[in-house]
Swiss-Prot record:
The gene is PiNMT. This is Picrinine-N-methytransferase. It holds the Pfam family Methyltransf_11. Residues 103-112 are annotated as: SAM motif I. Residues 193-202 are annotated as: SAM motif III. It is an enzyme of class 2 (transferase). Its EC number is 2.1.1.-.
């Protein structure tokens, strides 16, 4: 275990040292939107089984009290708590007369959010993801838990969702928008399918906001974020300020931002500890191949970037105007 950890740490720092040379090298091949979507679908199709072993049906970060030590049993509670905390921040009511009747989870993964919300809040949930393998897993989980009548899952494009305007009483996404190239269009699409008065919740990773004197991130900061994105098939990372800017001209109100970075960072040491054992490392390699292993490298870089204040985890919520 110790030898494996040392090797992985050396490789991680070696990769970070190569960032500047790689960025300054030949121009990267430009992928079309379709190719990027296919890459994201392939990434999750190949790595879903591997990460499900470690984190269950929730493929997103958990909510921890700052400074706590995360554990595997605790992480399964934390990922569910993250959902509840985001819904609380969005003002979701427990009152049967006021709570949403329907919810859409964009980028639903294995369906964990839909299954939890359907059970706890008695809300009919729909999930959409670009990965056919994830839809199959989500449908199997719903059947196992006896929730087929309360949840449904679709394979679809988040930029062109197959739903009518104003369909859902709550529109939710967590750790999906990072994969999307046209984030402004993604946000417009989420608002489009939200019913009048419906909360819209966007949560995930973001770059730090710029100071008034800055026009862009520093070159070395851009390099680090590009490397992280490359490892986990993210398109690029904008700031929460960008989200607010894109939401402002849309028919929404009550825009709020919540920085949750300190609430997710206890997860990093746990992930690194568990994934960097020889047993876990070889298991990830066997089940998920290089796609799963690259996530391990990314987690270390993400922990460093978050500690330096470059990488943020945040939520932006609003309500569609009536």
């Amino acid at each position: 275990m110790y030898t494996c950890s040392i090797i992985i740490y050396i490789l991680t720092f070696w990769q970070l040292s190569k960032i500047k040379k790689q960025v300054a090298a030949a121009e990267k091949q430009v992928m079309t939107v379709t190719e990027k979507q296919e890459a994201v679908a392939e990434f999750y199709d190949k790595s879903t089984d591997a990460w499900e072993v470690f984190f269950g049906e929730h493929l997103h970060d958990g909510f921890y009290e700052p400074g706590t030590t995360a554990t595997i049993p605790g992480s399964k509670v934390a990922v569910v708590r993250m959902i509840d905390e985001l819904l609380r921040f969005a003002g979701i009511s427990d009152d049967p007369e006021k709570k949403p009747k329907t919810m859409l989870d964009v980028g639903c993964g294995l369906g964990g959010t839909c299954l939890h919300v359907a059970k706890k809040y008695d809300i009919k949930c729909t999930g959409i993801t670009i990965s056919p393998e994830q839809v199959k897993c989500a449908q199997d989980l719903a059947a196992t838990q006896g929730l087929e009548s309360k949840v449904s899952f679709d394979v679809g494009d988040a930029l062109d969702m197959p739903y009518k305007d104003g369909t859902f009483d709550l529109v939710f996404t967590i750790q999906c928008i990072e994969h999307i190239q046209d984030k402004e269009k993604f946000i417009r699409e989420m608002v489009r399918v939200a019913a009048p008065g419906a909360p819209v919740v966007i949560a995930g990773y973001a770059a730090r906001n710029l100071s008034p004197s800055e026009e862009s991130l520093k070159p070395e900061e851009k390099m680090v974020l590009e490397k992280i994105c490359d490892h986990i098939v993210l398109s690029w990372l904008c700031s929460t300020g960008d989200y607010v800017k894109w939401l402002t001209p849309l028919p929404v109100q009550d825009i709020k931002v919540w920085d949750l970075t300190q609430n997710i960072t206890p997860f990093y040491p746990l992930c690194i500890k568990e994934a960097f054992t020889w047993k876990s490392f070889t298991s990830l390699l066997k089940m998920g191949g290089w796609s799963a292993i690259k996530v391990v490298f990314a987690v270390k870089m993400m922990a460093m970037a978050a500690e330096e204040g470059l990488l943020k985890f945040a939520a932006v919520t609003c309500r569609k105007s009536k």
